[in-house]
């Protein structure tokens, strides 16, 4: 069962119902990239996997409009709570998804969901999305997220180096470019699916 359709949907705060039109979606080794636009402006999102349990979502927009985050279609058995700077979505099995923001974000619980308001954002806006299999794992890892959100450069560099290492081992100079494309796709798929 899915925990949610999306744990973090971003929009411009002044019109949360406005439809965004996708401009570009790409998956690069180690990064998901998506850009979309509305009449209020464009939003770009980059998702990098910084550890086995956490992905860093970086958001930029072409305007200084306030941003609003919320979850979308939480599963029927999911209980959503807000604790300090984190949204915690718990499943009865013990699995949890957390969405952690920086302290300047105005976080509020609504019904079985949340809103996170970012006023006059300084870009990029960093959000950590994590998946944990137990309360113990969650407690141990949540304390590391403030440093990731405030200084993501080391984690992003480690992510780039990790992927470079994976790809360096499979790319061969004696093979045609088609081989390299297939090899990169295979490694990307295998690593992306390892936790499912």
Language model regions located:
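An extended acidic
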Residues: 1-38, 160-172, 176
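Acidic/polar, glycine-enriched structural segments that form the non-catalytic walls/loops
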Residues: 42-44, 49-196
């Amino acid at each position: 069962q899915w925990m949610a359709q999306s744990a973090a949907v971003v929009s411009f705060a002044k019109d949360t119902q406005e439809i965004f039109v996708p401009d570009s979606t790409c998956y690069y080794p180690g990064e998901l990239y998506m850009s979309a636009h509305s009449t209020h402006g464009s939003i770009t999102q980059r998702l990098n996997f910084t550890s086995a349990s956490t992905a860093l979502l970086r958001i930029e927009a072409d305007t200084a409009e306030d941003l609003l985050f919320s979850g979308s279609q939480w599963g029927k058995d999911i209980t959503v709570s807000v604790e300090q700077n984190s949204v915690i979505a718990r499943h009865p099995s013990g699995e949890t998804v957390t969405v952690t923001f920086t302290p300047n974000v105005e976080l509020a619980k609504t019904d079985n969901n949340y809103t996170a308001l970012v006023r006059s954002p300084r870009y990029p806006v960093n959000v950590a999305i994590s998946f944990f299999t137990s309360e113990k794992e969650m407690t141990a890892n949540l304390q590391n997220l403030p440093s990731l959100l405030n200084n993501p450069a080391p984690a992003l560099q480690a992510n780039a180096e990790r992927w470079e290492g994976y790809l360096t081992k499979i790319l061969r100079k004696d093979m045609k470019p088609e081989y390299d494309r297939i090899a990169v796709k295979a490694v990307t798929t295998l690593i992306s699916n390892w936790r499912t």
